[in-house]
Amino acid sequence: MPMQGAQRRLLGSLNSTPTATPNLGLAANHTGAPCLEVSIPHGLFLSLGLVSLVENVLVVAAIAKNRNLHSPMYCFICCLALSDLLVSGSNMLETAVILLLEAGALATRASVVQQLQNTIDVLTCSSMLCSLCFLGAIAVDRYVSIFYALRYHSIVTLPRARRAIAAIWVASVLSSTLFIAYCDHAAVLLCLVVFFLAMLVLMAVLYVHMLARACQHAQGITRLHKRQLPAHQGFGLRGAATLTILLGIFFLCWGPFFLHLMLVVLCPQHLTCSCIFKNFKVFLTLIICNTIIDPLIYAFRSQELCRTLKEVLLCSW
């Protein structure tokens, strides 16, 4: 990940020895003041990564199998699953290598570990950027399908979707390579934070606008059928609750990680910030949790995809 030297975990593992860590403890900073440090067990981290890996592999397999799902919307969902798969897979790979280094089962030179670290960092960073981009792309696709319903199939065509997907992957890989190469520069970390905030604002604006249009549509139906207003109010409350959950999960899972990046720039030596830095793996775990939740929100709610998924599972048995 694009962190300063303190977060280069693979290199640090070369000279480390296996130690037992509690699940929750107080770590002291350099002044002796206690810091709340939450230690995520490697087993839990790997288990969450494995769940994410299996979920997203199933989504990709189901979409690839069913030609009816080869539409622009499902292409974006498939790419989101693929990028989430790479997020969890790269973090699992890094954790596995750390465990092997700490156990002495993997003996190698520091230069080799540095190259491996850089490769994993680029893979992780590019997959995270892709994941954020495809979340934004799905929001844009849904927005166009609602506000330009009659022209949707002429606006969002499969060739355009493929070009957008290719552009996102290429831009993410190139950007992450530059980010890792210049990760010690504050401007790089600020760019990542600004990018996250831009995606958050984009999704919030689009989904709020879509909710407002849906409420207007429900109100029109209510007037047409002369139903009472509470039915419309109930629809608005359900829509607001769904929107709150959608954006809340996105912010809670991704926000702490980008807050960490921002604090690295703003207060790298501050005592409170130093305490927050100690919980870096917690922030990564939240991102892994988001890769588990994404298929539940964007993929498994589709009946067509779920039917195909059952076929894939039955064929595998």
Swiss-Prot record:
**Sites of glycosylation?**
N29
Which residues are the lipid attachment points (S-palmitoyl cysteine)?
A: C315
Gene Ontology molecular function, alphabetical: melanocyte-stimulating hormone receptor activity
Q: Which residues cross the membrane?
A: 38-63, 73-93, 119-140, 164-183, 192-211, 241-266, 280-300
> Mind listing the UniProt keywords for this protein, alphabetically?
Cell membrane, G-protein coupled receptor, Glycoprotein, Lipoprotein, Membrane, Palmitate, Receptor, Transducer, Transmembrane, Transmembrane helix
Q: Name one GO biological process term.
A: adenylate cyclase-activating G protein-coupled receptor signaling pathway
Look up the domain of life of the source: Eukaryota
Q: How does it sit in the membrane?
A: Multi-pass membrane protein
The residues exposed to the Cytoplasmic compartment are 64-72, 141-163, 212-240, 301-317
Q: Name one Pfam family in it.
A: 7tm_1
Q: Which InterPro entries match?
A: GPCR_Rhodpsn, GPCR_Rhodpsn_7TM, Melcrt_ACTH_rcpt, MSH_rcpt
- State where the protein is found: Cell membrane
Key word Cell membrane present: yes
| Extracellular side, ranges | 1-37, 94-118, 184-191, 267-279
Q: Which GO terms describe its cellular component?
A: plasma membrane
Q: What does this protein do?
A: Receptor for MSH (alpha, beta and gamma) and ACTH. The activity of this receptor is mediated by G proteins which activate adenylate cyclase. Mediates melanogenesis, the production of eumelanin (black/brown) and phaeomelanin (red/yellow), via regulation of cAMP signaling in melanocytes.
**Subunit and partners:** Interacts with MGRN1, but does not undergo MGRN1-mediated ubiquitination; this interaction competes with GNAS-binding and thus inhibits agonist-induced cAMP production. Interacts with OPN3; the interaction results in a decrease in MC1R-mediated cAMP signaling and ultimately a decrease in melanin production in melanocytes.
Q: Which PANTHER family does the record associate with it?
A: G-PROTEIN COUPLED RECEPTOR (PTHR22750)
Concerning its family, UniProt says: Belongs to the G-protein coupled receptor 1 family.
Q: What name appears for this protein in its UniProt entry?
A: Melanocyte-stimulating hormone receptor
Q: Which organism is it from?
A: Alouatta caraya
